UniProtKB/Swiss-Prot annotation:
PANTHER family: SPERMIDINE SYNTHASE, SPERMIDINE/SPERMINE SYNTHASE. Keywords: Cytoplasm, Polyamine biosynthesis, Spermidine biosynthesis, Transferase. Pfam families: Spermine_synt_N, Spermine_synth. S-methyl-5'-thioadenosine binds at residue 29. Residues 1-249 form the PABS domain. Spermidine binds at residue 83. Its EC number is 2.5.1.16. The active site is at residue 155. It comes from the Bacteria. This is Polyamine aminopropyltransferase. It is found in: Cytoplasm. SUPFAM superfamilies: S-adenosyl-L-methionine-dependent methyltransferases.
Length: 262
């Protein structure tokens, strides 16, 4: 048996699977979980793949990309995603997390897929809301948007950031879809003083890129090495990974030179 991952409209990958373990459908999402010899369990969420053996890569990178460039991380907002492992990493800081996800049926179906599902959901500093309007009005140190935001959503979320807050969003991979990344950088650069693309170094099973944006905080100039060294139980993230995430090949430096704001 095989499952297919669409990397771009013109590029696909196939993975061998042994069995389907779960099939859950809601009004807006489809979640299928498969057993794989090489990757443990594979979750297919609306054609995007999550590999249980490698969940730590994205969760560590995004959590500490924000956490290690901010002196304080008291309030965090996560929107448009299901990744509770990201919240698990963020709890390494003294922080409160607001997690906005309307689809409880799909979220609860990840109960055996996310290793720290119960630990996160039962944490007194974790608030799950169905929509942003359900949350108390506040400003955030870090906002993580796990789907590429349109201009209207970006405008709304940026108003919820503290003056030195950090906004991290998913985007297209700069090597695979550089035009899409270029457009996303233009949109971010029209709002923020800092807008820089990055990827997860050595991650071979993903078609994702990301953007780090802020009004005042810089992902490299404001990186705090002592905070990185204080982190425990890391399997992926370190200072070298953090810095390498922003490295671009010469041709992409040229492509993005008018769109990156640093």
């Amino acid at each position: 048996m095989w499952i297919t991952q669409e990397i771009t409209p013109y590029l696909r990958k196939e993975y061998t699977i042994e069995a389907k373990l779960l099939d859950v459908r809601s009004e807006h999402n489809i979640l299928e979980i498969f057993k794989s010899k090489d990757f443990g369990e594979i979750a297919m969420l609306n054609c995007q793949l999550l590999f249980k053996n490698f969940l730590h890569i994205e969760s560590e990178l995004l959590a500490h990309m924000g956490g290690c460039t901010k002196k304080e991380l008291k309030e965090v907002l996560i929107v448009d995603g299901f990744d509770l492992e990201l919240a698990h990493q963020l709890f390494k800081y003294d922080t409160h997390i607001d997690f906005v996800q309307a689809d409880e049926k799909i979220l609860d179906s990840f109960i055996s897929f996310f290793p720290h599902f119960h630990e996160v959901k039962n944490n007194k500093n974790f608030t799950h809301a169905k929509q942003l309007l359900d949350l108390d009005i506040k400003k955030y140190d870090l906002i993580l948007c796990l789907q590429e935001p349109d201009i209207h959503k970006m405008d709304g979320l940026k108003r919820m950031l503290k003056e030195d807050g950090v906004f991290i969003s998913v985007a297209k991979h700069p090597l695979l879809e550089h035009v899409s990344m270029q457009n996303a950088l233009k949109n971010m650069g029209g709002v923020f003083s800092v807008a820089m693309p990055f990827v997860a170094p050595l991650r071979i099973l993903s078609n994702k890129g990301y953007i780090y944006a802020s009004f005042k905080t810089h992902p490299l100039k404001d990186l705090m090495t002592p905070k990185i060294e204080a982190l425990t139980s890391m399997r992926y993230y370190n200072e070298d990974i953090h810095r390498a995430a922003f490295a671009l090949p010469k041709n992409l430096q040229e492509v993005f030179k008018d769109n990156i704001k640093s």
